[in-house]
Amino acid sequence: WHFSKTEIEHLTQAIIAFTIALAFMSVGGIFGALEFPTAFILGGIFWIIPLAPAFTVHEIAHKIVARNYGCWAEFRASPAGLRFGIILAAIFGFFIMAPGAVMVAGNTTRSQFGKIALAGPVSNILLWGVGLGMVALGLETTNFTYGGHGLLFFW
């Protein structure tokens, strides 16, 4: 487990950009943010709670599998992708974002590279299963909701 200073900075930038875009989405864009600044700020705070762990686990899953195959692997943010997502969310109230990718260097087979690529989405499916299990057990109850849904609804 080694995370360079650069990788930590890039993960942080991506999480912040995602949070800003989701905050814009929660109020319908820049005009909603200007009209309801408190809702914009609370939307950002609300979204960072499920987003940060889900995004981080997704990216680290790629890294762990790559490292398991003896590869160097680190997340690198895409500044253009992050800006595009924020601008899209600010203007239209929805977004598509290409936050970056885990860069992998080393000799891998096609099968190994496929497993590295699948590790992130599989980690999100597993997190969804954990969240679904918690909801099924009634553990989603929280006084902190957004749109009538607790945090696990979004995780």
Tell me what each language-model feature is.
Residues 1-155:
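Hydrophobic transmembrane alpha-helices and their immediate loop junctions
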